[in-house]
Amino acid sequence: MAAFLLRHVSRHCLRAHLNAQLCIRNAAPLGTTAKEEMERFWKKNTSSNRPLSPHLTIYKWSLPMALSVCHRGSGIALSGGVSLFGLSALLLPGNFESYLMFVKSLCLGPTLIYSAKFVLVFPLMYHSLNGIRHLLWDLGKGLAIPQVWLSGVAVVVLAVLSSGGLAAL
């Protein structure tokens, strides 16, 4: 029985290769191209004067929403900062000590140095603490709306306090 089935399939495949019409008869022509569909979409949207969806002006901003945007932004800033620091360490002449001595020779005030250190460390602390918050969410903890707000406030307060402490070192 298997031999008959194998022979039938082999003959069918051989006929398909020899007769190109078998392949073409199953092809269906496309009604429109992607470019035509895109043009039709934009024409319809511009004629109806609707904003793009989702449009940011229709949302009422809340703390969890702002913290989510800031978490993404701090991740991008940290990634860019580390990449820039690594590239500058490779490409700039001298070593880290020479640049540190240059900054010390500028005789900047302690308030300016503290502020600069705070600005540098705050994104790291915020992103780290908010990342722990997201890991807790992944475990299913703290997903009720009041808990989301409370954990958001806690992350901001802890980030400010820990950044202030680290900047004071």
Swiss-Prot record:
Record field: transmembrane: 63-92, 113-137, 145-166
Topology feature Mitochondrial intermembrane, residues: 93-112, 167-169
Alphabetic keyword roster: Electron transport, Heme, Iron, Membrane, Metal-binding, Mitochondrion, Mitochondrion inner membrane, Transit peptide, Transmembrane, Transmembrane helix, Transport, Tricarboxylic acid cycle
SUPFAM superfamilies xrefs: Fumarate reductase respiratory complex transmembrane subunits
Cysteines paired by S-S bonds: none
Transit sequence range: 1-29
UniProt pathway annotation: Carbohydrate metabolism; tricarboxylic acid cycle
Cofactor(s) the protein needs: heme b
Matches recorded under InterPro entries: SQR/QFR_C/D (IPR034804), Succ_DH_cyt_bsu_CS (IPR018495), Succ_DH_cytb556 (IPR014314), SuccDH_FuR_B_TM-su (IPR000701)
Gene Ontology BP, a term: proton motive force-driven mitochondrial ATP synthesis
Top-level lineage group: Eukaryota
Positions in the Mitochondrial matrix compartment: 30-62, 138-144
Binding site for heme b: 127
Membrane topology annotation: Multi-pass membrane protein
Cofactor binding note from Swiss-Prot or TrEMBL: The heme b is bound between the two transmembrane subunits SDHC and SDHD.
Protein family according to the UniProt entry: Belongs to the cytochrome b560 family.
Quaternary structure and interacting proteins, as annotated: Component of complex II composed of four subunits: the flavoprotein (FP) SDHA, iron-sulfur protein (IP) SDHB, and a cytochrome b560 composed of SDHC and SDHD.
Functional summary from the UniProt entry: Membrane-anchoring subunit of succinate dehydrogenase (SDH) that is involved in complex II of the mitochondrial electron transport chain and is responsible for transferring electrons from succinate to ubiquinone (coenzyme Q). SDH also oxidizes malate to the non-canonical enol form of oxaloacetate, enol-oxaloacetate. Enol-oxaloacetate, which is a potent inhibitor of the succinate dehydrogenase activity, is further isomerized into keto-oxaloacetate.
Name listed for the protein in its UniProt record: Succinate dehydrogenase cytochrome b560 subunit, mitochondrial
Natural source organism: Mus musculus (Mouse)
Gene giving rise to this polypeptide: Sdhc
